Amino acid sequence: MAKDIKFSADARSAMVRGVDILADTVKVTLGPKGRNVVLEKSFGSPLITNDGVTIAKEIELEDHFENMGAKLVSEVASKTNDIAGDGTTTATVLTQAIVREGIKNVTAGANPIGIRRGIETAVATAVEALKANSVPVSNKEAIAQVAAVSSRSEKVGEYISEAMEKVGNDGVITIEESKGMETELDVVEGMQFDRGYLSQYMVTDNEKMVADLDNPYILITDKKISNIQEILPLLENILKTSRPLLIIADDVDGEALPTLVLNKIRGTFNVVAVKAPGFGDRRKAMLEDIAILTGGTVITEDLGLELKDATIEALGQASKVTVDKDSTVIVEGSGAAEAIANRVAVIKSQIESATSEFDKEKLQERLAKLSGGVAVIKVGAATETELKEMKLRIEDALNATRAAVEEGIVSGGGTAFVNVLNTVEALDLSGDEATGRNIVLRALEEPIRQIAINAGFEGSIVIDRLKNSEVGTGFNAATGEWVDMIEAGIIDPVKVTRSALQNAASVASLILTTEAVVASQPEPASPAPAMDPSMMGGMM
């Protein structure tokens, strides 16, 4: 396929047009009074959202050169979303500002490589200054504020702070669609896995159809139990203690299952059997997690252990186990705290080295089950369109909150960027590097300018007053008042602000140093096939 090639100013200006189209679409959503963007879907109702990365991913331009520019900005939004989970619109606004100012200087004859060095130095200084201005987040109220700012809902802020308090910072918080119109929080404490009882005759509460076991022993094995004789000596020993038993095995079938059920119905023995969670290597890892949590041992041939030789010492224990037809919850396992902490550390290191998103997600789930529990925010709304929009907002808020706990917070609403202007301006640079620094200085003003414009105020007036205000004082675009931003709860996570700036500078620098762009030529439309004369019949 033939290629179109553009050079120098032609190449850069075509890409800048794409940058502007995408950024102008996304930046209308910035701030407390930002607007929504409606995205057409190939099927179903349109998606209404103010989520920067969702909008950026949908934009596809007809001109190949413009599309490359748009895709590079979309990459900034995606990368920021991957690292910090929020701040995608801010990153887009910063990218546009750096590109716009940079192109002016490159066109005027400045060396793009020198400008790039200046931009990199200025951004590194700004990031250090942001970190120096950060305030750690530890209490529930601060977490609720971060989530409320990101989601634009105090109620959502309360749900997220409550969820993080109950399951911990490493805990899994999932967002699901509610069957009703109300949004609610559901917390499952302890370890839960998606396997229910193998027979409904094992339930202890016929009304709720659940089996509750108090202070049970837990037999954990990756073997299939078909012959009751294999575990009979163990069952006899447990029977003497009058305690219930939970069996977690590859499967329980053959004569073993009806024998266990019969003893349960007769009241001889309270036992519940469930299948082991997961598949393959993941199943072995999850069984090991359960064993460590409950202080038991996995009966497996890998360790040279047989069921017939199992003793009570090899069994796990917990204060309570609840089993329904779909899931099992183990509460307060008797495992040693040190062993659990070591296992958590191992899983954390596996998460860091995992390359696949799926593997990371599954490891994160295992980590949560070991270290606290699982919280589910069930999102309710009147229409499907509103539901999708609300889910996106809550996901952003959850990511922003985790980022805040990790690296602390700074004043929100674009104030933090203006607060570091003096530090960046003090850099002793010369020539094109000084030009690069000045480009960053101008770009740092852009988020607050856009927030003010979206709220109906004059951006330049707001910036001038902000520069002359004390550090921490900022403009509340929602009310038009000047307030102490952190006290007013208008805050941004440091991780979000620094990621937005670093990613914007990285991609903008690449665009400025571009000297040639190669794109595929659009294929000409194939002509319609000529009609076969023999098919014209009696028309002649």
Swiss-Prot record:
Disulphide bond pairs: none
**Domain of life of the organism encoding this protein:** Bacteria
Q: Where is the signal peptide?
A: none
Enumerate the InterPro entries for this protein.
Answer: Chaperonin_Cpn60_CS, Cpn60/GroEL, Cpn60/GroEL/TCP-1, GroEL-like_apical_dom_sf, GROEL-like_equatorial_sf, TCP-1-like_intermed_sf
**E.C. number(s) listed in UniProt:** 5.6.1.7
Q: GO CC terms for this protein?
A: cytoplasm
Q: Where in the cell is it found?
A: Cytoplasm
Which GO terms of type biological process are on file? protein refolding
- Entry keyword set: ATP-binding, Chaperone, Cytoplasm, Isomerase, Nucleotide-binding
Per the record, the major location class is: cytoplasm
The record lists the catalysed reaction(s) as:
ATP + H2O + a folded polypeptide = ADP + phosphate + an unfolded polypeptide
Protein's job: Together with its co-chaperonin GroES, plays an essential role in assisting protein folding. The GroEL-GroES system forms a nano-cage that allows encapsulation of the non-native substrate proteins and provides a physical environment optimized to promote and accelerate protein folding.
Family, similarity comment: Belongs to the chaperonin (HSP60) family.
Q: Which proteins does it associate with, and in what oligomeric form? A: Forms a cylinder of 14 subunits composed of two heptameric rings stacked back-to-back. Interacts with the co-chaperonin GroES.
Name used for this protein in its record: Chaperonin GroEL
Source organism of this protein record: Streptococcus constellatus
Organism ancestry: Bacteria, Bacillati, Bacillota, Bacilli, Lactobacillales
Q: What is the gene name?
A: groEL
